[in-house]
């Protein structure tokens, strides 16, 4: 896998809470991980079905990613997230 994501922040009832970074997917390659640690990547936020922001982070995509990977790999199972937004063209857009 040549893509990778990093959860940089978690939220509880919309309030920031401290967390250690979480990297994915399992088996993430060194290249994407190093780029994430250099603060590269596409910014995203994940939300639950009540519209509460649950986590945010960055994605290093490859030619095969759909950009749903952080949601599918981590957000749904760990936070109950149902949608993801990316920073595009000066604003947050639902994917």
Q: For each of these PLM feature ranges, what is it?
A:
Residues 11, 48, 87-89:
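Acidic surface patches and DE-rich sequence motifs
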Residues 24-28, 52-58:
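Feature captures hydrophobic
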Residues 2-29:
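Negatively charged, low-complexity tracts enriched in Asp/Glu with abundant Ser/Thr
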């Amino acid at each position: 896998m040549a893509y990778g994501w990093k959860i940089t922040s978690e939220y509880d009832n919309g309030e920031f809470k401290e967390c250690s970074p979480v990297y994915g997917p399992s088996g993430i390659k060194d290249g994407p991980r190093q780029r994430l640690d250099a603060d590269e990547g596409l910014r995203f936020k994940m939300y639950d079905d009540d519209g509460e922001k649950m986590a945010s982070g960055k994605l290093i995509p490859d030619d095969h990613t759909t950009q749903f990977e952080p949601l599918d790999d981590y957000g749904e199972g760990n936070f109950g997230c149902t949608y993801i937004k990316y920073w595009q063209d000066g604003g947050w857009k639902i994917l």
